[in-house]
Amino acid sequence: MHISELVAELGANLGISLQMSDAGTCRVIFGDDAVDFEQSGETLYIMAELAPATGREDAYARLLAANWLGAESGGACIGLDEEKNSFALWATERGDVPYPEFEARLTLFIKALRYWKEWLSLPAAEPANQT
C-alpha cells in the first residue's frame, strides 16, 4: 500500500478519519502516547518523543545498547532530538508496504515507545563512586 493508503487504513482500523495534511504530516494519539507521521517522497517517518534528555546522562549508554540492531527498540531507532533536547524514537516505512506488515511494525514501535517512556520516567541512576 502507498503511504496515504496505509494512513487511511490505520484510521479506519482505529475508527477515525485519518489522512496526511497538505504538509504531509499527521499525529495519532494512542492512549497517552503521541505518534507523528511525516511523509517525504516515498518514505513515511514515524516519530515519538520519549523524554527530556536534560540531566539524563546516565541513560545514554543504556539507550545506545538498546538501539544496537534494534534489539530493544522494536526495530526502531532511539536518538536525540537536539532541537527539543529530548530522546526520541523513530522508524521509517518505504515504498509499497502491505498493511499487516505496517500494523505489526507500528505495534512494536508503540510497545517500545511505552517501555522507554516508562524507563526514562524512573529517577536517574546515581553515578558510581570512583575510588
PLM regions: where:
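Short, well-structured hydrophobic secondary-structure segments
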Residues: 36-49
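Charge-rich, low-complexity N-terminal segments
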Residues: 1-34, 71-75, 79-81
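Helix-rich interaction surfaces within compact, conserved domain-sized segments
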Residues: 105, 110-113
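Short, highly charged C-terminal tails/helix-capping segments
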Residues: 120-131
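Short, charged/polar, Gly/Pro-enriched secondary-structure boundary elements
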Residues: 35-36, 97
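Short, internal acidic amphipathic alpha-helical interface segments
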Residues: 47-83
